[in-house]
Structure formats: structure tokens, C-alpha cells
């Protein structure tokens, strides 16, 4: 057994020399135990810390529109910032594992605030089947997987269907974003979600239009 472990460690070290794992933000080689981003970049990650603020800006986006207990986002996405590479590589670079890693980081930090208390199920914002076939995965689902790894809360990817393949929301105004996502989601299994407290997970939050469209499917489910 010891010999097997030594061989695995040796192979891992050898492969790291040939193909070093690098921080997706700064490009420096990752140290042992680091994932996705190095410790320095993790410390400097522009966190919102909204989970520590009642009536935070994310929660205010949805006031008066859907029943909401709490909402947050992990870090600020700023144009020109190196940290944008995290999401760019997750969405367009085929690096789905970044989603799981960032989901774990986020969940670990939110645990102490009891943000996940009472949540029964996680629903990642679904992609249209054509877009998911092209990309090969749903990045929001991978973020949700990371959250599940820390919290143990199950994921539901079947109860809500994205029935329209919409244009990208980039460069659209608030009204255009709302029009673009109106009626794009369809509830498939209301009986499964009855009486459940649901966490909706998306990769990027700007105006909240997509999240709102998804959540609107749930407002008539009994007991939500």
C-alpha cells in the first residue's frame, strides 16, 4: 500500500513538472493543495460579502417580484479584471471543473452565515439543449455540484426546462434582457417541488432577468 501511494505521489509530481497546473487568474504554477486559483489570487478575489448584509443589492433586485428569503453573489465581475478569466474559462474554455471548485469555495464561506439553512433542493439555471450540446455541459450545474459537495443539498436538473434558445444577454438593456428571457422556462414536475425551499444557482448575475424568469415558474407551486 505504501509503495502504491509513493508511486502515485511520484507520478503526480512528475506530471506537474511536465504539465504544471496554473492559476487561471495570474498564470503562476499552483502549489500542492491549491485548486483553480492560487492563494494570493484567492485572497484578492473581489468578494461581495453580500451574504453578510441583510437587504443587500442582489436581494433588492427581486423585491416585490418573487417570494425571496435571501440572495447573494460570490464575487464582482469587472471588465478588464484578470478575475474575469475564471468565468470566461468556465463558460467558453471547456473547464467545467472550475465551476465545481468555485462552488465549493463559495459554499464553504457561506456556511457560517447559515445561508443554506432550510434549503431542500438546488436548481441550476438550465441551458437550452442545443446550447448544452455545443458547450458539452451546463456551467451553472457545475457550480451547483460544488455547493452540493459542501452542503449535501441535492440538485434537481429535471423539474425546469429551458424551452427557448435565446440570444446572449450581453450588451442588452434591462428591458431587452427581460423581453429576451420572457417565457423561456417551463415547469415540468411541480409535484416534486411542492413544499420545498429552493436555491436557484446561476453563473452570472447582472439585472437578475434570467433568475427571475426561472423563479417565476415556481411561484404557483404549492408550499413554496
Go through each PLM region and give its residues.
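Glycine-rich phosphate/pyrophosphate-handling loop used in enzymes and phosphotransfer proteins
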Residues: 1-202, 206-224
